[in-house]
Amino acid sequence: SLQAGALTTTFTSSQGLMLMIPAMYAMGGQFLPSVMHIASRVVTSNHHSIFGDHTDFMTCRTTGYAMLMSSSPQEAMDLAAVAHLSAIKAGYAFMHCFDGFRTSHEMQRIEALDYEDLRPLMDTEALDAFRHKSLNPEHPTNRGNNVNPDIYFQCKEGANVKAAVVPETVQHYMDEINKITGRDYKLFNYYGAEDAEEVIVVMCSASEAVKETVDFLNANGRKVGLVQIHLYRPFSVEHFAAAIPASCK
């Protein structure tokens, strides 16, 4: 459907995601703006479990997909929009991940985004360009060719150039969602003491529990903080370093 110019999304996790990996390499490598929403769960190994775990999406780190992480139902609502908007503008495949059951089945009141607020944020020129590149007998193209190592290497290096624009694109749309919602999303959100000497780095629902721990420890004389990862892939070292207080040891 993506090759035909249709905006395509799916929802999956665990073993279902494992079955998609071969196709993900093709979609990620061809920069098709698919979006997958992943309620991350255990992948069966020596035992079976249906509960939350990062095994499934961690297995997909080399597929060429960007990975956006949510820690709560509200974040899942807001960052889902960021994933879709960024996929179109950057011309990049996205996974939007949140913890299975802990977040995906949590009963919580949220503020739903209005589609009319999101409509002006869509990059229509990028959308038209994506549809123009779709398979069409009126303007045939050749894709998925067999190439020698020299060309393969150049294509891989070209993918790095494409990935380099993703962090700024994601932050741009986070800023737009911040304007609509009044919330404060960044690629890496910092929480805790401004002069923290110890900082823990987490992503997804663990950050909600860590925030309570940070509050408790700071109230008892410790200087601690939390860096919450939202954009895990492509990982921006520059933005990550900027989120950590200079006092951190």
Each language-model region and where it sits:
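Hydrophobic alpha-helical scaffolding
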Residues: N46, M69, P73, N142, ...
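Conformationally flexible catalytic loops at phosphate/diphosphate-handling active centers
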Residues: F94-N189
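Cofactor-binding loop segments of dinucleotide-utilizing enzymes, especially the Rossmann-like FAD-
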Residues: S13, A39, D99, M203, ...
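Structural beta-sheet core signal
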Residues: T10, M36, H96, I200-V201, ...
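Glycine-rich beta-alpha junction loops
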Residues: R41-V42, F98-H105, C204-A206
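Short helix/loop capping segments that flank catalytic or ligand/cofactor-binding pockets
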Residues: M20, N46, H105-M107, A209-K211
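Thiamine diphosphate
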Residues: S1-C60, Y65-I88, M174-K249
